[in-house]
Amino acid sequence: MNLPFFLAKRIYANNTDKTRVDRPAIRIAIAGVAVGLAVMLVSVSVVFGFKHTIRNKVVGFGSHIQVANFMTLQASEQYPIQMGDSMLKVLRAIPGVRHVQRFAIKQGILKTNSDFLGVAFKGIAADYDTTFIHQHLVAGAIPHFSDSVGKQQVVISQAIADQLNLKLGDKVFAYFIDNTGVKARRFSVAVIYQTNLSQYDKVTCFIDLYTAVKLNAWETDQASGAELTVNDFDRLDDTAARVVNKVNRTIDRYGETYSSQTIQEMNPQIFSWLDLLDLNVWIILGLMLSVAGVTMISGLLIIILERTAMIGILKAVGARNVTIRRTFLWFAVFTIGKGMLIGNLIGMGLIALQHYTGLVKLNPATYYVSTVPVEFNLLVWLLLNVATLLISVFVLIAPSYLVSKINPATSMRYE
């Protein structure tokens, strides 16, 4: 059997004397590792959950990549672009693209007897993936929107419903103003949704693509553009580059120029803010590893000083400094392991509690979510545990050299 491992195991197993000086030090070291690991697990889980939740909401409103008229992407006004079957086929054939859906935007005003509100009507058809709307459905059933028949039904947010005092099934007039005059439509509220992403909830309604195209006075094969969903968000830039090479700067049969833009380019403030969360995580990880390292160093030094006589006896019977150092490093591994076990139980328990109960609430007007989102990632969990163990042991190598300074004659005479 490995001698340092055997000695460390005996020392750790027999460390039950309540009068020993090193017992509080060991407990503090275990607590330091446990708290540090628990905080790291919870912090990473919250940041992952928060980033992915907000990102998915933004993507839900605009997909990963938009292909549209060059002028539309440069200004707030909507310009049409040909989006017929041939172009859709080209977009769907691009590697990395999972789904393609058409859309048309028309600015308008929703008006009730007591109030009115300017909104953006987003026309969608049968090819539109409504999973995002279903996930945030408050009331109603999503109509089967079409590009060939007008439904006269509208999907509105809870924020719009509250401001205009609308409920499911209510009739509401919409007015559209352009160079030809004012157009009016009467819609029935078919669905109410709520994402808590206020800048979208306050202005976004969904209608059928047919009505949106007609209100814009466009041709039947024209739209505001197409939204592309990619297979892997981490490879968004690669897929976007393929879209640029395939589509950008090409001209449709009406003389309009195609262009494209990623969701990150359309929402730079939100994604820059989410990127800052990564910096916060690294700061927290650094602080927690420092706390765990300092408590372990202090504990190891106290343990070595407390067992000076034992070190002297081991040296007297021929044990080398490296053997004794390894003994105390193995002892530290046992201590760190116990702390990590407790830390994992605490951290994973808190993550599970928040995931299943939503115990910690947030102000959705500020944070875009009503509860703190958490997300468990197995790979990150493994990396955090391995990194905590390796770093904690690594920082103890230098303090363990204190063993070589202990003189066996002096230590045994003292005993």
Task: Tell me what each language-model feature is.
Residues 2, 9, 377-415:
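C-terminal membrane-exit region of the final transmembrane helix in multipass inner-membrane proteins
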Residues 2-10, 130-132, 261-263, 353-367:
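Peri-membrane helix termini and adjoining interfacial loops of integral membrane proteins
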Residues 21-48, 275-310, 333-342, 390-394:
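Hydrophobic alpha-helical transmembrane segments of multi-pass inner-membrane transport and secretion
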Residues 51-85:
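Membrane-interface junction motifs in transport/secretion proteins
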Residues 81, 85-221:
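A structural signal for hydrophobic secondary-structure junctions
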Residues 177-281:
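Mechanotransmission and gating elements of multispan inner-membrane complexes involved in transport
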Residues 301-303, 310-354:
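Transmembrane alpha-helical interface segments in multi-pass membrane proteins
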Residues 338-384, 397-401, 405:
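Short helix-loop junctions at transmembrane helix boundaries
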